[in-house]
From Swiss-Prot:
Residues 915-932, 1116-1133, 1262-1288, 1311-1322, 1330-1348, 1535-1553, 1740-1758 have a biased composition (Gly residues). It comes from the Bacteria. Belongs to the mycobacterial PE family. PGRS subfamily. Keywords: Repeat. Pfam families: PE, PGRS. The keyword Lipoprotein does not apply. This is Uncharacterized PE-PGRS family protein PE_PGRS54. InterPro entries: PE-PGRS_N (IPR000084), PGRS_rpt (IPR048996). The keyword Repeat applies. SUPFAM superfamilies: PE/PPE dimer-like (SSF140459).
Length: 1901
């Protein structure tokens, strides 16, 4: 049995920590991969490269091992996480948890603690851990603190258990939490928490148990020198005191930080020792010295170590005192800065001195002894001194200068590196301690690299110049001395001396210059010139020397030899029959490589530098190309010239010597020899001339082509030195191309007969031989023999001439003549050895046969037969292959295609009422040509046979003029196809041509229309038969039979006469479609395919029935005429073995005529619309050919659309109702389909007429206006038409024919008419309400679907019509001195039509959609107030109620309720009248806005799966009127109050569902209207300005509609926003007197209260308070007499800003309360008056104080007790007035004191002090005024009941002090005034800035 205890949450946390650790390691491995696996070599030598490769391999092995370890780590974490989950699952399933729950329940309920169990760990920052169980249980852990917050204390244990650990302190120095107390009897105290980063103190350990259990350990101090926590005390008997926490390291810095002190050990118990003190922290490291300059900076001093903690007090009886803590170690000194690179003339700077190590920390005192038998504790040991800092590295020497390019000069010497810095002194320890060791000396700087030698100059006309030598590398810097050890203690080691630097690398030698190219040959066929040699590369520079023990620099690399010049190109051969191209020139020799530089010498014990590598020899020049042979336009081409020899390669440079004086170092490697030049390419042979072409129309043979010239031989490759690579031989030249054979002449056309044959093509010329390849160079390795040149391409054979075209028929109806035969193609030319033969010429194409003539018009003569096509020409043979492996015989030529047969002539068109003529037959296609033969290669295929000619189209039948139309003519037969040509030896025979397509039968003529009003139309003519398809040759494809002609369309019936509404005429029947032609017979062979039968013609469409006549006024419309019957489809064409054609489709029945429209009512109800005509029956489908499918029957005609009902008349007089609209006409029945056809759909019912509008109201009997008339009811929609032959109710679809027919769908019921709009109420005194809107018409019933004859599914019945929309209610009249009238109620929506009944197997139609209720009318606007002292505005009218939605039929969708009307706007209050001497009139109060109308109720659902309608939306409340402005008076008057916003309308109730399921959603309530703005206060006239008026209250939101059974209640609207308070009036200026003070500004008006929301709605926001008025300016002081001038007046105080309005309260439920309004801005204080000039002068007046900011409005209260809305912010304080200027005088008066700012949101700036007066006497001096104090910030608005208090505003800035007065002549200037103090922030606001002092005055002269 296991005794291991597992805490699953700890295991899960450990798995998470391991996951993070694995991610960190993986990221570190990835970042280090590139640096560790691709190690760069320290030098260019082989040893450095091998070492780098070795360490790179180690890096790769590490990465591979890391990948395996990461995979194991991932599997381990996965197993750990899985185990934690398993333990957690086992705990959850264990019975222990259930038993503990039963045991702990009573004590948990009574005392708040369990009986058994651990306390919970805290989760919130700084939270305390939970207490353990009363009997058994450990305390929970405290949570870590937030930044700057102390960690939470650990929870206490019960009787038996350990205390919980304290939480860690937050970053920024937070103290760790104290550990929890151990159990009352047994248990260890919890450990204290770790202190937060930034020097936080660790938490104290918890006390132990009474009987047994030590105190907890103190927490470790926070990073940055935190002090450790005290250990917990032991309790009575056996527990030892806890150990103190350790201090932490001090942070780094210029001087390292002091380490943290160790914590005090805990006191022991009666029988137990005290705890040990904590160890002190290590001092921080000193900062590094700065880099750069001639001398690097000195490193910083290390920090002092922390003192160890004191041991705990010993036990009362037997325990010893605790041991003191170990002192902290001193910090390490900083590293010295690196010396700058090359700062003193190029020499590197000396490294800086290392920093001094830190002083060691003191040991902690031992713990005191106990009372009886215990001893004191030992003191802690002293810490170790810090190590001195390392000296800085010396700077690198500058590199030597590179020599200029193309000069060959030696590079400059590199500069010496700087010396390393001295190591720092070790830190001191006190007696008994250990001193710190000295720092290591710095590394010497690296010597500079030598400069690169200059490259040799290129030579455009000779040998290239040699490159210059590289410069010598610079010497390395000396290493720095080690630092001294510390003093005061024992130990400490002198620092190690620094290493010497590395000597500089020698410079690279310059590259040799390139030699110039040889001259090209100028004379025809001459040899090109030899190229020049390249220059030698320069020697590498010597490496630099190093100091003792250092590493020398490596020698420089020798320069690369210059490249040899290219040989000149040979001349081109002359243009003559024997001209040969010239030989190319020899390439120049490459330059020798430069010698490697000597390695640098080493000091004693050092490593010598390696010698430099020798330079690479230059590449030899390429040989010149041979000249091309001459072309010969009239004979054989010339041979190409031989290519030039490649140049020899340059020798490699010698390796450099090693350095002296030390060990190691390698001799430089010898340079590589250059690569020999490539031999030149042989010239191309000239092309042979082409054979002459025969003349066109001559039928002659074309001339043979001439042979091409031989290609030139390739040049030899250049020689290489020992070890070098030889040049490759040049490639041989390509042989010339043979000439093309001439084309054969074409056959002549024959205008009177058959065409002539074309001539044969000429033979192609032979190809030229390819040139031999060049030899390789000698002396080295490698090099390739040049490739033999390619033989030329044989000439192509000439193309055979085309046969001539045959003549067309010479007269009307005569046949055309045959085409001529195509000529044979010429043979291809033979290739040379290994070449490619020419292809045989293509055979000529046979001529096309002539077209037959067109038959004459009139009675319709037949067309002529087309001529046969000519045979295709035979193809030429391919050329013979040349000798060799790569030879390829030529392909045989392509055989000519046979000519196409001529097209048959078209039959003549029939005259009116006569048939058309037959089309002529097509001509036969020509035979294909024979394919060309080839000796060994691929033979050509035979030519394709010509296609047979297309048969002529039959003539079109004549159109009927007084009767039936004529039939169309029969189409001509297609021509037979030509045979395919025979293949060449091994080639495939050509494919036979395709048979010609039969001609298309002519279309039948259209029947005549009816001859008069209401008469029937005539039948259409029959379509002509299609021609038979032509037969194919052996294996060919037959032509398809011709398509039968389409039957003619029947004539349209005439339209019925207007007036009383006559019926329309019947449409004529459509003509039958023509029969299709038979397909052609298949040819002999496996691939033969018989032709398809032709497509049968479609039957003609029946004529459309005539439209019924329109009814006269108040009469019904006429019935529409029936549609004509469709024609029968044609018979499909037959085929012997292939696919037979399908029969033609029957014609569509004609569409029934539209019923006539009912007449409009003039004095009453409108007339009904006429019934629509029946649709025509469909034509039958044609029979199929042998094996073919019968044609589809046509579609039955659609029934006519019923006529629209007439519109009802409007009301006959003022205030009377309108009349009803007429009923819509019934739709016509759909036509029946033929067997298998598709029936026509029933016609749609007509739309009901719209009801008439009510008449407008009038003034009747005095001041009241008349009510508006009610709108007329809309007419019902017409029912759908009947199907064919079915009497009675319902617009049924047609029945299906026998077979797989599809019955027609029932018609759709008509839409009900829209109700008329109610009349508008008249403007009156008082105003009148608007009339009610008319109800919408009911929708028509859907038609019944057609019946299927097979007993299968019948057609779907028609949908019911939609109900008409209710009319809109009339708008209320505007008030004229009174309240506005209310809007009329919207009309009720029409009920939906019932869906059509289902037939056997069919689907019933859907019910229509109920009509939407009409919109309620808008209320009228209230009138403005009367012109009086307080003329209040009138209220707006109430919005009309929305109409009720129409009901749906069974299963339909109900109409939505109408939207309530908008309430009218309240009238504006009048401005107050101007006051008399005493007081002005007050502004009038704005009128209240009208209440929004109630939304209409939604329609109820029909029985079944109906969807009830949504309730209407309540109307929006009207806006309140604005208050009038107060008059300017004495005193001035306050502004009027704004009117209240109207209340939002209530939402409509949702429709009820008849099935008991969910009903529709109810409508949303309307939004409340916005409150009106308060009026502005009047300006003061010798008094204080008037206060602004209060803003109007926002309207309450409308209540959401009540829910029906199962439905959803509507949402409440949004409460209206409160109006803005008016602005206060401005105070008057002061009176003209000695101290005329200005008057105060008026107070801003209070913002209006926000409207309340309904249940669950959103409240309106409170209005914004008005701005306080500006204070008046003080008057200037009066001019003084001889004694004293008058003082300037004080500016008036600014008015106080208005209080923000309170936000609306939330409705019951999930409502959102409104925000409080924003307080108004305080008014600006007035400016103080200027002091008068006098003797002495008078002080300037004091500036007025700024007005206080308004208080923020209170946030709305939430009814649910949850968070309420935020309160408004306080207003900003007004700016203080400016102080007056002091008067000029004798002894200067003090400047006026700046005004004090008012309290407010953002305090205003204090006024500036006035300037001091000028001195009065030579000894006097003025005193400046003192700047005003900044205003205090206003208090923030109070928050709602659950949100707390808002922040106060910011304090204002203090005013600036006044400038001192200027002294009189001989006097002294005044002193500068002091700046004002900044205002204090209130409730969280920031204080303002103090003002600036003034400038002193200037002394007098």
């Amino acid at each position: 049995m296991s005794f291991v205890l597992i805490a699953p949450e700890f295991v899960t946390a450990a798995a998470g920590d391991l996951t993070n650790l694995g991610s960190s390691i993986s990221a570190a491995n990835a970042s280090a991969a590139s640096a560790t696996t691709q190690v760069l070599a320290a030098g260019a030598d082989e040893v450095s490269a091998r070492i780098a490769a070795l360490f790179g391999g180690f890096g790769l092995e590490y990465q591979a091992i890391s990948a395996q370890v990461a995979a194991y780590h991932q599997r381990f974490v996965q197993a750990l996480s899985t185990g934690a989950g398993a333990y957690a699952s086992a705990e959850a399933a264990a019975a222990e948890q259930i038993v503990l729950g039963v045991i702990n329940a009573p004590t948990q309920a009574l005392l708040g603690r369990p009986l058994i169990g651990d306390g919970a760990n805290a989760t919130t920052p700084g939270g305390a851990g939970g207490a353990g169980g009363l009997l058994f249980g450990n305390g929970g852990a405290g949570a870590a603190g937030a930044p700057g917050q102390a960690g939470g204390p650990g929870g206490p244990a019960g009787l038996w258990g350990n205390g919980g650990p304290g939480g860690a302190g937050g970053s920024g120095g937070g103290t760790g939490g104290a550990g929890g107390a151990g159990g009352w009897l047994f248990g260890v105290g919890g450990a204290g928490g770790v202190g937060g980063a930034g020097g936080g103190t660790g938490g104290a350990g918890g006390p132990g148990g009474l009987i047994w259990g030590g105190g907890g350990a103190g927490g470790v101090g926070g990073a940055g020198g935190g002090t450790g926590g005290a250990g917990g005390r032991a309790e009575l008997l056996f527990g030892a005191g806890g150990a103190g926490g350790a201090g932490t390291d001090g942070g780094p810095g210029a001087t390292g930080g002091t380490g943290g002190h160790g914590g005090v050990g805990g006191d022991g118990g009666w029988l137990a020792p005290g705890g040990a003190g904590g160890a002190g922290g290590q001092g921080g490291a000193g900062g590094a010295g700065s880099d750069g300059g001639a001398l690097g900076g000195t490193g910083g001093t290390g920090g002092t170590g922390g003192a160890g903690g004191a041991g705990g007090r010993g036990a009362l009886l037997l325990g010893a005192g605790g041991q003191g803590g170990l002192g902290g170690a001193g910090g390490q000194g900083g590293t010295g800065g690196a010396g700058g690179d090359g700062v003193l003339g190029g020499v590197g700077g000396t490294g800086g001195k290392g920093g001094v190590g830190g002083v060691a920390g003191l040991g902690g005192a031992g713990g005191a002894a106990g009372q009886l038998f215990s001893a004191g504790g030992a003191a802690g040991a002293v810490g170790v001194g810090g190590t001195g800092g390392q000296g800085g590295a010396g700077g690198a020497g500058a590199a030597g200068a590179d020599a200029p390019a193309s000069t060959g000069l030696t590079g400059g010497t590199g500069f010496a590196g700087g010396a390393g810095g001295v190591g720092g002194q070790g830190g001191n320890a006190i007696a008994g301690g250990i001193n710190g060791s000295g720092g290591a000396g710095g590394t010497g700087g690296q010597g500079g690299a030598g400069g690169m030698g200059g490259s040799g100059a290129d030579n455009a006309s000779g040998i290239g110049a040699d490159g210059g030598a590289g410069g010598t590398g610079g010497n390395a810097g000396a290493g720095g001395a080690g630092g001294a050890a510390g003093t005061g203690g024992t130990g400490g080691v002198v620092g190690a001396a620094g290493k010497a630097g590395i000597g500089g690398t020698g410079g690279q030698g310059g590259a040799g210059g390139a030699g110039s190219a040889g001259t090209d040959a100028t004379a025809t066929g001459a040899t090109g010139g030899t190229g020049f040699s390249g220059g030698a590369g320069g020697a590498g520079g010597a490496g630099g020397n190093t100091g003792v023990g250092g590493t020398n620099g490596s020698g420089g690399q020798g320069g690369t030899g210059g490249a040899g010049g290219a040989g000149g190109a040979g001349g081109v051969g002359a243009d003559n029959p024997t001209g040969i191209g010239g030989t190319g020139g020899t390439g120049g020799k490459g330059g020798a490589g430069g010698a490697g530089g000597q390695g640098g010498s080493s000091g004693a014990g050092g490593t010598n530098g390696s010698g430099g590598a020798g330079g690479t020899g230059g590449q030899g020049g390429a040989g010149g190309a041979g000249g091309a042979g001459a072309d010969n336009p009239t004979g054989i081409g010339g041979a190409g010239g031989t290519g030039g020899t490649g140049g020899a390669a340059g020798a490699g440079g010698a390796g450099g010597a090693i350095g002296t004086g030390g060990t190691g170092g390698a001799v430089g490697s010898v340079g590589n020899a250059g690569i020999g030049g490539t031999g030149g390419t042989g010239g191309v042979g000239g092309a042979g001339g082409a054979g002459a072409a025969a003349a066109a129309g001559s039928s002659a043979t074309g001339g043979a082509g001439f042979a091409g010239g031989a290609g030139g031989e390739g040049g030899a490759g250049g020689n290489s030195g020992v070890g070098g690579t030889n040049g490759s031989g040049g490639a041989g030249g390509a042989g010339g191309k043979g000439g093309t054979g001439g084309a054969g002449g074409s056959g002549a056309d024959n205008p009177t007969g058959a065409g002539f044959a074309g001539g044969a093509g000429g033979t192609g010329g032979a190809a030229g031989a390819g040139g031999a390849g060049g030899a390789t160079g000698t002396g080295g390795t490698g090099g390739v023999v040049g490739a033999t040149g390619s033989a030329g391409i044989g000439g192509a054979g000439g193309r055979g001439g085309d046969g001539g075209d045959g003549a067309s028929g010479l007269g009307l109806g005569l046949s055309g003549f045959d085409g001529g035969q195509g000529g044979q193609g010429g043979a291809g030319g033979s290739a040379g050895a290994g070449g490619i033969n020419g292809a045989g010429g293509a055979g000529g194409n046979g001529g096309d046969g002539g077209d037959g003539a067109t038959g004459a018009a009139g009675l319709g003569d037949n067309g002529g037969v087309g001529g046969d096509g000519g045979a295709g020409g035979a193809a030429g043979n391919g050329g013979n292959a040349g000798v060799g492996l790569t030879a390829k015989a030529g392909d045989g030529g392509a055989a000519g295609n046979g000519g196409n047969g001529g097209a048959g002539g078209a039959g003549g068109a029939g005259d009116n009422n006569f048939n058309g003529g037959q089309g002529g037959a097509g001509g036969q296609g020509g035979q294909g040509g024979l394919g060309g033969a080839s000796t060994t290669s691929i033979n050509a295929n035979g030519g394709a046979g010509g296609n047979g000619g297309t048969g002529g189209k039959g003539g079109a039948g004549g159109a009927g003029t007084l009767g039936v139309g004529g039939s169309g003519g029969t189409g001509g037969d297609g021509g037979d196809a030509g045979s395919g040509g025979g293949g060449g030896f091994g080639g495939a025979a050509g494919k036979a041509g395709g048979g010609g397509n039969g001609g298309r039968g002519g279309d039948g003529g259209d029947g005549a229309s009816g001859l008069g009003l209401g008469l029937s139309g005539f039948d259409g003519g029959q379509g002509g038969q299609g021609g038979a398809g032509g037969s194919a040759g052996a294996g060919g494809i037959n032509g398809a039979g011709g398509a039968g002609g389409n039957g003619g369309d029947g004539g349209d019936g005439a339209t019925g006469a207007a007036g009383l509404g006559d019926n329309g005429g019947v449409g004529g029947d459509g003509g039958a479609g023509g029969a299709a032609g038979n397909g052609g017979n298949a040819g002999v062979g496996l691939t033969a395919k018989a032709g398809d039968g032709g497509a049968a013609g479609n039957g003609g469409n029946g004529g459309a029935g005539g439209a019924g006549g329109a009814g006269d006024n108040n009469f019904n419309g006429g019935q529409g005429g029936a549609g004509g019957q469709g024609g029968q489809g044609g018979l499909g064409g037959a085929s012997t073995t292939s696919i037979n054609a399908n029969g033609g489709a029957g014609g569509n029945g004609g569409t029934g005529g539209k019923g006539g429209a009912g007449g409009a009512g003039t004095l009453g109800v409108g007339g009904s619309g006429g019934t629509g005509g029946d649709g025509g029956d469909a034509g039958s489908g044609g029979g199929g050919g042998f094996g073919g499918a019968a044609g589809k029957a046509g579609g039955g005609g659609n029934g006519g659309v019923g006529g629209d009902g007439g519109e009802g008349a409007s009301g006959l007089g003022l205030g009377l109702s309108g009349f009803d609209g007429g009923q819509g006409g019934q739709g016509g029945a759909g036509g029946s389909a033929g067997a298998g056809g598709i029936n026509g759909a029933g016609g749609a019912g007509g739309t009901g007429g719209a009801g008439g509008d009510g008449a407008p109201a009038t003034l009747i009997g005095g001041p009241d206006g008349g009510d508006g008339g009610q709108g007329g009811i809309g007419g019902d929609g017409g029912n759908a038409g009947f199907g064919a032959g079915v009497p009675g109710d319902g617009g049924d679809g047609g029945n299906a024919g026998f077979g797989a027919g599809v019955p027609g769908d029932g018609g759709i019921g008509g839409t009900g008419g829209a109700g008329g709009a109610g009349g508008a109420g008249a403007d009156g005194d008082p105003s009148i309400d608007g009339g009610q809107g008319g109800a919408g018409g009911h929708g028509g019933q859907g038609g019944k679907g057609g019946l299927n004859s097979t007993g299968l599914a019948s057609a779907a019945s028609g949908d019911g019509g939609n109900g008409g929309a209710g009319g809109a209610g009339g708008n209320g009249g505007d008030g004229d001195g009174f309240i506005g009238g209310s809007g009329g109620t919207g009309g009720t929506g029409g009920d939906a039509g019932v869906g059509g009944l289902a037939n056997t197997g069919g689907t019933a139609g859907n019910a229509g959609i109920g009509g939407a209720g009409g919109r309620g009318g808008d209320g009228g606007a209230g009138d403005s107030g009367a012109l009086s002292q307080d003329g209040n505005g009138f209220a707006g009218g109430q919005g009309g109620q929305g109409g009720v939605g129409g009901n749906a039929g069974a299963g339909g969708i109900n109409g939505a309720g109408g939207t309530g009307g908008t309430g009218g706007a309240g009238g504006d209050g009048q401005n107050g009248t101007t006051g008399v001497a005493s007081e002005g009139g007050a502004g009038g109060q704005g009128g209240d806005g009208g209440q929004g109308g109630i939304g209409g109720a939604g329609g109820n659902a029909g029985f079944g799966a109906g969807v009830p309608g949504d309730g209407g939306i309540g109307g929006t409340g009207g806006a309140g009127g604005a208050g009038g402005a107060g008059a300017d008076g004495d005193p001035s008057i306050d502004g009027g109050q704004g009117g209240a916003g109207g209340h939002g309308g209530q939402g409509g109730k949702g429709g009820l569902n008849s099935t008991g399921l969910a009903s529709a959603a109810s409508g949303d309530g309307g939004n409340g209207g916005a409150g009106g703005a308060g009026g502005n206060g009047g300006d003061g006239d010798g008094f204080i300005g008037g206060s602004g008026g209060t803003g109007g209250t926002g309207g309450d939101a409308g209540v959401g509609g009540l829910a029906n059974t199962g439905g959803t209640a509507g949402n409440a609207g949004i409460g209206g926003a409160g109006g803005r308070g008016g602005d206060g009036g401005a105070g008057d200026s002061g009176a003209l007197s000695q101290d005329g003070n200005g008057f105060a500004g008026g107070q801003g008006g209070q913002g209006g209260v926000g409207g309340n929301a309904g249940a669950g709605g959103i409240n309106g926001a409170g209005g914004t308070g008005g701005t306080g008025g500006a204070g008046g300016d003080g008057q200037n002081g009066t001019t003084g007499v001889a004694s004293e001038g008058g003082a300037g007046g004080q500016g008036g105080d600014g008015g106080q800003g208005g209080i923000g309005g309170a936000g609306g309260n939330a409705g019951f439920g999930a409502g959102v309360p409104g925000d409080g309004g924003i307080g108004g801005t305080g008014g600006a204080g007035g400016a103080g008056g200027a002091g008068a000039d006098g003797d002495p002068s008078i002080d300037g007046g004091q500036g007025g104080a700024g007005g206080h900011g308004g208080q923020g409005g209170k946030g709305g209260l939430n009814s649910t007790g949850l968070a309420s809305a935020a309160s408004g912010d306080g207003g900003n304080g007004g700016a203080g007035g400016a102080g007056g200027n002091g008067g000029a005088g004798g002894l200067g008066g003090g400047g006026g004191t700046g005004g004090t700012n008012g309290n407010g949101g953002l305090g205003g700036g204090g006024g500036n002090g006035g300037a001091g007066g000028a001195g009065g006497t030579p000894t006097g001096s003025g005193t400046e005024g003192t700047g005003g104090d900044g205003g205090d910030a206003g208090a923030g608005g109070n928050g709602g009941s659950a949100t707390g208090v808002g922040n106060g505003g910011n304090g204002g800035d203090g005013g600036n002090g006044g400038d001192g007065g200027n002294g009189a002549p001989g006097g002294f200037g005044g002193g500068a005034g002091a700046g004002g103090l900044g205002g204090s922030g209130a409730g969280g606001g920031t204080d303002g800035d103090d003002g600036n002092g003034g400038s002193p005055g200037t002394d007098g002269s």
